[in-house]
């Protein structure tokens, strides 16, 4: 049973749950496990713009260096950039200090292995063992054997150049609005679009340590919708705090979510004979409309549990090269080993230019069923107990009977917050909203 690592690393409220002491122990235990005693380990460390990032970075690095790891800091940079730079710099591991789309008070620490993939479960469990018994680590290097720290000033440039190498199209004539969520993409995204020739308007690109994800970015695209219309832009692109996800807005100011972007990307790859096994990997949260569009266009779907971790596992295991989530995590495995919001946005812009049609027109290939998501706030320890209550089970069965095969109910505990997410999908939005709200209220009442 995991104690510290969740679905996306170790997360919590910075300085109370994710403390400096825990960050130090994560560095010390992680460095020791990854070293395996046979060579001097090199670790790439990046972060997003949260005020707690510097504090946790200092503690984490102290832990790593205390067991002889050499650390390459790359500063504020998207999570997928750390995955890429870990490979480019020949490091043994990469670490990101970020809580992605979560509010500023949260932070997280996530490890990548030398190939840019998330650590295997067994390694995370081994790290947890040492965290709980830190004195078992009998590694106290002295003198020249203590770890060194080096800051890589070219890290951002290296990532931008790599992204540009993937795109062969000139973006001249394309007007884009970028919502950087006051997060890790605030420099990289505008630079790469500008250097590819696009006309760029950036919003929420002035981080102050406290405004990351605040009423902006991929989880709050309303500001972007207004900006696209105000500037008469061709496209709006919203990232989250660590830029591992993307939500788009078409030229009419309408949201284009991960499902739409995935089906467009899959069709583009298939058209160019580059979609591995003609298969797109999605999660159970993807809209029924995506299933229909895929079937009509000869694209196979492989469906996993919610979480880009499970999408990636399926892709690697079965040799697929495209997968993602409705929330905007999209993995283009030919280019990177994790969700990459900036890469996804470049690929979407490239598709629009290749098709020579507005996004609203090309995205109409998929019709979206109404989908309602309501959160039930509960005690964290009760997240997985909802089916233990007969009243909740009975209400779910009642809703399924009402939908009668023309929709579905999906209940999912959050991997990072004290929430149970209730999702309903069906033909009539008013009906499913009422049903979802009632079910969420019942779950909250029983599990709070």
From Swiss-Prot:
One MF annotation (Gene Ontology) recorded for this entry: phosphoglucosamine mutase activity
Gene3D superfamilies: Alpha-D-Glucose-1,6-Bisphosphate, subunit A, domain 3 (3.40.120.10), Alpha-D-phosphohexomutase, C-terminal domain (3.30.310.50)
A GO CC term attached to the entry: cytosol
Catalytic activity: alpha-D-glucosamine 1-phosphate = D-glucosamine 6-phosphate
Record PTM text: Activated by phosphorylation.
One Gene Ontology biological process: UDP-N-acetylglucosamine biosynthetic process
First-tier enzyme category under EC: isomerase
Keywords: Isomerase, Magnesium, Metal-binding, Phosphoprotein
Keyword Isomerase: yes
Residues engaged in binding Mg(2+): 100, 240, 242, 244
Pfam families, per the entry: PGM_PMM_I, PGM_PMM_II, PGM_PMM_III, PGM_PMM_IV
Signal peptide: none
Residue positions where Phosphoserine is found in the record: 100
Cysteine disulfide partners in this protein: none
Protein EC: 5.4.2.10
Cofactor: Mg(2+)
Cofactor note: Binds 1 Mg(2+) ion per subunit.
Active site per the UniProt annotation: 100
Function summary: Catalyzes the conversion of glucosamine-6-phosphate to glucosamine-1-phosphate.
HAMAP family, per database record: GlmM_B
Family the UniProt entry places it in: Belongs to the phosphohexose mutase family.
Family annotation (PANTHER family): PHOSPHOGLUCOMUTASE (ALPHA-D-GLUCOSE-1,6-BISPHOSPHATE-DEPENDENT), PHOSPHOHEXOSE MUTASE
Record-given protein name: Phosphoglucosamine mutase
Biological classification of the source: Bacteria, Bacillati, Bacillota, Clostridia, Peptostreptococcales
